[in-house]
From Swiss-Prot:
Gene (name only): infB
Name the record gives this protein: Translation initiation factor IF-2
Positions of the UniProt region annotated as G2: 414-418
A GO cellular component entry from the record: cytosol
Originating organism: Stenotrophomonas maltophilia (strain K279a)
SUPFAM superfamilies xrefs: Initiation factor IF2/eIF5b, domain 3 (SSF52156), P-loop containing nucleoside triphosphate hydrolases (SSF52540), Putative DNA-binding domain (SSF46955), Translation proteins (SSF50447)
Ranges of biased composition (kind: Polar residues): 81-92
Keyword terms, alphabetized: Cytoplasm, GTP-binding, Initiation factor, Nucleotide-binding, Protein biosynthesis
Annotated region (Disordered), positions in chain: 53-92, 163-292
UniProt domain tr-type G: residue ranges: 380-549
C-alpha cells in the first residue's frame, strides 16, 4: 500500500463505507474534511490501535500480528482401551489421549539492506570462527602425534638400554661362575672309589663277600671326577645368601643336580632309570619351614561384641579351646554366641594374646564428618523453657493462660501425662515451652525435659508448698546446670502463703533474691493472670544473660521430645530443632530410625515451610517410631541415613543378645538359691506415645519384690494388634492399653483365649490395678493373732482329763477348741490344743478377762503353777505389694 492512499481508496480496501471510516478516524482523534484526503501510514497504525482497543483486544505490533497469522494450534483426542492385570483377573480401562500441537508457517518478512548487510557480516564472522577452531584442532592433533612419536622413541631407547644391561649382567654372572669353577678345580681332589675292592661287612656276623670281576670302566669317568669337588661343596653352597636367582644361576643349578644324579646307582639316567629318592646326604638342602621357637603373640581387633567362633578364628585356635577358656573364667557360652568386648579382651589375654579396640563405626564417622561441615554464623535464638513442678500445682494452667488455650481440661484426670511442646509469640519475643508431667512415675520425662531446656520454671502452689516432685525437679535442674525461676502459683486463694513457700525452698538451697540469693521468684495466678507479665519479663532477662545463640542455616540437628504411631499418618516424632534449619524433603536419622521428611506440623496443626533453632515441630516420614530422647540429625542422602540406622540397630541387637544370653555361673547359683516360689506377672503394655510407654514400664517393674516379679514382655506405641494379643495369650500376660484400643482381630483372639485386657487413661489407675492383680497372685498369708492369756494358779488331777490347770484370764479372751501355747519363764515349752474349758464344773465356750476357769490341755500333763497359757487363732490375711 503506497503512501498516497486516500480515505476513499482505504474504505474500498477494507470493505467499509466511507462515512463509517470517517467516523472511526474521528473517534481515533483524526479530523478529515472529505474522502479524497490522503491517509499516511502512521495514521493507519493509529486507526488500527483504536479499533483493537474498541473491540477489547490488546494492541499488537505488525510483526506479532504477522507471526500470529502464520501460527495454528490443533487439539487431537484419541480414545483406546487398555487391559490391566490385577492379580488373577483382567480389567479393561478406557484411556483418552489428548495432544496439542502448534504449527508455524515458514517464511519471514523481507529484510532491509541494513539487515542484509548485518546478516552477511554475522555469517562471515561465524565462518571465520569455525575455520579458526578447525585450525586449532588440527594443530592439537599434530602436537599429540609428535608427542606420541617422541614417547615411542624414548621407550625404544630405554628398552635397548635395559637389554644391554641384562646382557652385561648375564656376562658378568657367567664370568663369576667360571671363576668359581676354576677355584673349585684348584682344590685337592678326593681319591676315586675303587669299585673292584671288596666292601667291608655291615655287621661283624656277616661273611666277607667274594671278590667280583672288574666291571668295564665307566664312560663318564672324567665327568664324575669333575663333579666330585662340586659334590663336596654341596649344591646349596654356591647359591648361599641369594634370595632370588637369575636365569643363568637357575640353569646351572638344574645342570648340577642332573650331573649329580646321572650314572649313580639308584639314580635316574637319561634312559629313564629309577632315581635315588633317599633323604640326607650331600643333596639334602635346608628345610623350607622351621617351627617357631617362641610363642606367637597376635593383636586381635575386637569390636563392641564378637562371636566366639570369630574370636577363635582371629586367635588361630579351635573354637572348643576358647569355650574352655571362657568356662574357666565362669562364662557359659556356645561357639555361636556373642560376648561383649570386655569378656573377649579378658579371654584373649588369658590365652596369651593382645586385644585392641576395633573401630566398627564407619557410618557413624561419616555422619560426624557430614555434620561437622555445618559451620555458619551463630545468631540469637529463642529460649527453651521447661515448666516443672508437683502434680496439680498448675503447670499446664499457667501455660494455657500464656497460650490462651485450654489444654488442662482435655487431659485425662486433669494431669499431664506426656511432654507438650509449644512455641509462643509473646510481647517479649518468641519463647518455646516444654510442659512436663508432675506425677512420680514420669521421672524420666522430667529428666529429659531438664536436659533439653535453657531455663526451668518451677511452679509451686502457694497453698501446698514444696512437695516430693518439687524437690526432684530442683535436683534435675541442678544436675543439668540450668538456671531456675520459681513461679509461686495460686496466690489468689485465701490460704495462700508465699512466705512459707520461700522458707521451704530455702531448706532446699534455693534462695530468693529477697533473701539475698540469685533465684528469681515471681508470685502469679494462672487463673486470673496476675503476675504473668512479670514471669515473662524474668524469663526474657534470664535469656539475655545466657546469650543463647545457634546456627540458623545448614543441616538441622536436635532431640526427639516425644513420638507416637498415628493410624492415618504413621510414625510421628515431635522434635526440638537445636541447630540448623529443618525443611520438608530432608533425610534424617533418629536413633535406629531414618526417613525423609514428608511433612512438618506445628502445635496448631499448620504446616510451616521450615523449623529453625528452638522450634518444636512434628515430623512425618520416618521408618518407625523413635525412642523419646534420641538425637536426630539431617544427612545428605538416604544411603548414609540407612547405613547409620542399620549399624545402630545391629549394635543394639548384639548388645541385647549379650545382655540376655547365657548367665554367669554365680548368677545361676544365686537364682537357684533364691526363693523358688517367686511369682511372675507378665504384662503387655501399649500406649499412645513413647514417653508414656517408658514411664509405665519403669513404674510397674519397680513394683517387683522378693515374692513377685513383674515382667514386661512387650511394650510399644500404637493400638493393640493381633500380634500383641497372640504374644499375651502365649505368655499368659495381662494386656494394658493406655489411651489406645484393640482392633477387631485382636479382640477375637483375646476373647477366645481369655486374655485379661484392661484400658486406662490415668497412670494412677494403672499402678493401682497392677497392684491388685499382683496381690491376687500372691494369695493369702496365714497370720497368728493372740486373743487371750491365762495364768496358772493351781493344778488339779482329774481321772478323765488328767492335769487340769486352775487359771485366771489376765488378758483378752480364752476360747474353747482354739490352739494354745504353754509358756514357762516366757519360753514356749508346748504347743497344742485346748481340750476342755470349764467354769464352776460347767463347760463354757469362752472365758473373758478377770475370770477364773479350769483349763485342760490335750495330751499334756506337765502343767505347773506360774505357767502361762496363751490362746491364739490363725487368720488369713491377703498379701499386698
Amino acid at each position: 500500500m503506497s503512501q498516497q492512499t486516500t480515505i476513499r481508496k482505504l474504505a474500498e480496501l477494507v470493505n467499509t463505507p466511507v462515512e463509517k471510516l470517517l467516523e472511526q478516524l474521528a473517534g481515533a482523534g483524526m479530523k478529515f474534511s472529505g474522502p479524497d484526503q490522503v491517509v499516511t501510514s502512521s495514521e493507519k497504525v493509529k486507526l488500527l490501535g483504536f479499533l483493537r482497543r474498541s473491540h477489547g483486544k490488546p494492541e499488537q505490533a505488525p510483526e506479532e500480528s504477522d507471526q500470529s497469522a502464520k501460527k495454528i494450534t490443533l487439539n487431537r483426542r484419541k480414545q483406546q482401551e487398555v487391559t490391566v492385570n490385577s492379580g488373577r483377573s483382567k480389567t479393561t480401562v478406557n484411556v483418552e489421549v489428548r495432544q496439542k500441537r502448534t504449527y508455524v508457517k515458514d517464511g519471514a518478512r523481507a529484510m532491509t539492506p541494513d539487515e542484509e548487510r548485518a546478516d552477511i557480516l554475522r555469517k562471515l564472522e561465524e565462518s571465520r570462527a569455525r575455520n579458526l577452531a578447525e585450525q586449532q584442532a588440527l594443530a592439537e592433533k599434530d602436537r599429540l602425534r609428535d608427542e606420541a612419536i617422541v614417547r615411542a622413541r624414548e621407550e625404544e631407547i630405554a628398552a635397548k638400554e635395559r637389554a644391554e644391561a641384562e646382557k652385561k649382567a648375564a656376562e658378568e654372572a657367567a664370568a663369576a661362575a667360571k671363576a668359581a669353577e676354576a677355584l673349585a678345580a684348584a682344590k685337592p681332589k678326593r681319591a676315586p672309589i675303587d669299585e673292584t675292592a671288596p666292601r667291608p661287612p655291615r655287621t661283624p656276623a656277616a661273611a666277607p663277600a667274594a671278590p667280583r670281576s672288574a666291571p668295564p670302566p665307566p664312560r663318564n669317568d672324567d665327568r664324575n671326577n669333575r663333579s666330585a669337588p662340586r659334590n663336596e661343596r654341596g649344591p646349596g653352597d654356591r647359591f648361599a645368601g641369594q634370595m632370588h636367582l637369575s636365569a643363568a644361576d637357575r640353569a646351572r643349578r638344574g645342570n648340577s643336580n642332573n650331573s649329580n644324579t646321572r650314572g649313580r646307582p639308584g639314580g635316574r639316567n637319561q634312559a629313564g632309570g629309577r632315581r635315588d629318592m633317599s633323604r640326607g646326604g650331600n643333596n639334602a638342602g635346608p628345610h623350607a619351614f622351621e617351627r617357631p621357637t617362641a610363642p606367637v603373640v597376635r593383636e586381635v581387633a575386637i569390636g563392641d561384641t564378637i562371636t566366639v567362633a570369630d574370636l577363635a578364628q582371629k586367635l588361630a585356635l579351635k573354637g572348643g579351646e576358647v569355650v574352655k577358656a571362657l568356662f574357666k573364667m565362669g562364662v557359659m557360652a556356645t561357639i555361636t554366641q556373642s560376648i561383649d568386648h570386655d569378656t573377649a579382651a579378658l579371654v584373649t589375654e588369658e590365652l596369651g594374646h593382645k586385644a585392641i579396640r576395633a573401630n566398627d563405626n564407619d557410618a557413624e564417622d561419616a555422619l560426624l564428618a557430614s555434620t561437622g561441615e555445618n559451620q555458619g554464623e551463630a545468631t540469637q535464638r529463642p529460649p527453651v523453657v521447661t515448666i516443672m513442678g508437683h502434680v496439680d500445682h498448675g503447670k499446664t494452667s499457667l501455660l494455657d493462660y500464656i497460650r490462651r488455650t485450654k489444654v488442662a481440661t482435655g487431659e485425662a484426670g486433669g494431669i499431664t501425662q506426656h511432654i507438650g511442646a509449644y512455641h509462643v509469640d509473646t510481647p517479649k519475643g518468641v519463647i518455646s515451652f516444654l510442659d512436663t508431667p508432675g506425677h512420680a512415675a514420669f521421672t524420666s520425662m522430667r529428666a529429659r525435659g531438664a536436659k533439653l531446656t535453657d531455663i526451668v520454671v518451677l511452679v509451686v502452689a502457694a497453698d501446698d508448698g514444696v512437695m516430693p516432685q518439687t524437690k526432684e525437679a530442683i535436683q534435675h535442674a541442678r544436675s543439668a546446670g540450668v538456671p531456675l525461676i520459681v513461679a509461686i502459683n495460686k496466690i489468689d486463694k485465701s490460704d495462700a502463703d508465699p512466705m512459707r513457700v520461700k522458707n521451704e525452698l530455702l531448706s532446699e538451697q534455693v534462695v530468693a533474691e529477697d533473701f539475698g540469693g540469685d533465684t528469681q521468684m515471681v508470685e502469679i495466678s494462672a487463673k486470673t493472670g496476675l503476675g504473668i507479665d512479670d514471669l515473662l519479663d524474668a524469663i526474657s532477662i534470664q535469656a539475655e544473660l545466657l546469650e543463647l545463640k545457634a546456627v540458623d542455616e545448614g543441616r538441622a540437628s536436635g532431640v526427639v521430645i516425644e513420638s507416637s504411631l498415628d493410624k492415618g499418618r504413621g510414625p510421628v516424632a515431635t522434635v526440638l530443632v537445636q541447630q540448623g534449619r529443618l525443611k520438608k524433603g530432608d533425610y534424617l536419622v533418629c536413633g535406629i530410625q531414618y526417613g525423609r521428611v514428608r511433612a512438618l506440623f506445628d502445635e496448631t496443626g499448620k504446616q510451616p515451610e521450615f523449623a529453625g533453632p528452638s522450634i518444636p515441630v512434628q515430623v512425618l516420614g520416618l521408618s518407625g517410631v523413635p525412642e523419646a530422647g534420641d538425637d536426630f540429625v539431617v544427612v545428605e542422602d538416604e544411603r548414609l541415613a540407612k547405613d547409620v540406622a542399620q549399624q545402630r540397630e545391629t549394635k543394639r541387637r548384639e548388645s541385647r543378645l549379650v545382655a540376655t544370653a547365657g548367665s554367669r555361673m554365680e548368677d545361676i547359683m544365686a537364682t537357684l538359691g533364691k526363693g523358688e516360689g517367686q511369682q511372675v506377672l507378665n504384662l503387655v503394655i501399649k500406649a499412645d506415645v513413647q514417653g508414656s510407654v517408658q514411664a509405665l514400664s519403669q513404674a510397674l517393674v519397680a513394683l517387683s519384690n522378693e515374692d513377685i516379679r513383674i515382667n514386661v514382655i512387650h511394650s510399644g506405641v500404637g493400638g493393640i494388634t493381633e500380634s500383641d494379643a497372640n504374644s499375651a495369650a502365649a505368655s499368659k500376660a495381662t494386656v494394658i492399653g493406655f489411651n489406645v484400643r484393640a482392633d477387631a482381630s485382636a479382640r477375637r483372639i483375646i476373647e477366645s483365649n481369655g486374655v485379661d485386657l484392661r484400658y486406662f487413661s490415668i497412670i494412677y489407675d494403672v499402678i493401682d490395678q497392677v497392684k491388685q492383680v499382683a496381690s491376687g497372685l500372691l494369695g493369702v498369708e496365714i497370720r497368728e493373732e493372740i486373743i487371750g492369756i491365762a495364768e496358772v494358779r493351781d493344778v488339779f488331777r482329774s481321772s478323765k482329763l488328767g492335769a487340769v490347770a486352775g487359771s485366771m484370764v489376765i488378758e483378752g479372751v480364752v476360747r474353747r477348741n482354739k490352739p494354745i501355747r504353754v509358756l514357762r519363764d516366757s519360753v514356749v515349752i508346748f504347743e497344742g490344743e485346748l481340750e476342755s474349758l470349764r467354769r464352776f464344773k460347767e463347760n463354757v465356750e469362752e472365758v473373758r478377762n478377770g475370770t477364773e476357769c479350769g483349763i485342760a490341755v490335750k495330751a499334756y500333763n506337765d502343767v505347773k503353777p506360774g505357767d502361762q497359757i496363751e490362746c491364739f487363732e490363725r487368720i488369713e490375711v491377703p498379701r499386698t505389694l
